[in-house]
């Protein structure tokens, strides 16, 4: 068995990563691939909490720009994260990983309500916990949710699983050939360099809790496991104040 560096993690999966090449919606093939990747980490006896984004279906900020009330648009985004979480739960259970879904907005017919102590108990019993519905409040991103849940469950690290992006760059490498990749940054660097990794609320919370983040490409097979065992891939973002 590989020696793990992080014994309890929050895995933040962007909505776009669940869509794959389709660009929107949920790609069952991608779900199956992710489930196997997560199982490889689960088999190392790592405690896993998962937060899914919803950008493959809906973005509250986009809805607000089109004239919707921002709070209403954000609630729609929360529902999108729950749909993604249910799809991932199904994929994980198909490969034999016991999984519980908890939502910040109660919908008991399909998931448990989010209760921190219950989530901790699930993790102690060796279950993966998927946190759906964001924080349950409008104006807060799923990146903030990941930072919050990481603090609440005592995670050692937040893994920012990106769709085709292998770290943090000085500019968009797809459009700027001079863009350089950072191997390590601090949360203050993100703000001072105006790097669009996560919103400032999420950065501030991560800085306060001093939980590190690792940004990496989830599309590369084996990358989640490589990060957990301590291989140097992606970009490490320290929570140093």
Curated annotation (Swiss-Prot):
EC number(s): the record gives 2.7.4.22
Query: Which Gene Ontology cellular component terms are annotated?
Result: cytoplasm
The family database entries (InterPro entries) matched by this protein are listed as:
AceGlu_kinase-like_sf, Asp/Glu/Uridylate_kinase, Uridylate_kinase, Uridylate_kinase_bac
Tell me where on the tree of life, at the top rank, the source sits.
Bacteria
| Entry keyword Oxidoreductase | no
The keyword Nucleotide-binding is assigned to this record: yes
Q: Where does ATP bind?
A: 12-15, 55, 59, 163, 169, 172
Name the reaction it catalyses.
UMP + ATP = UDP + ADP
- Any idea which UniProt keywords this protein has? Allosteric enzyme, ATP-binding, Cytoplasm, Kinase, Nucleotide-binding, Pyrimidine biosynthesis, Transferase
Q: How is its activity regulated?
A: Allosterically activated by GTP. Inhibited by UTP.
Task: Identify the stretch(es) annotated as Involved in allosteric activation by GTP.
Answer: 20-25
Any GO BP: UDP biosynthetic process
Q: How does it assemble?
A: Homohexamer.
Report the PANTHER family cross-referenced here: URIDYLATE KINASE, URIDYLATE KINASE PUMPKIN, CHLOROPLASTIC
Task performed by this protein: Catalyzes the reversible phosphorylation of UMP to UDP.
Which protein, by its recorded name, is this?
Answer: Uridylate kinase
This protein's species is Lactobacillus helveticus (strain DPC 4571)
Taxonomic classification? Bacteria, Bacillati, Bacillota, Bacilli, Lactobacillales
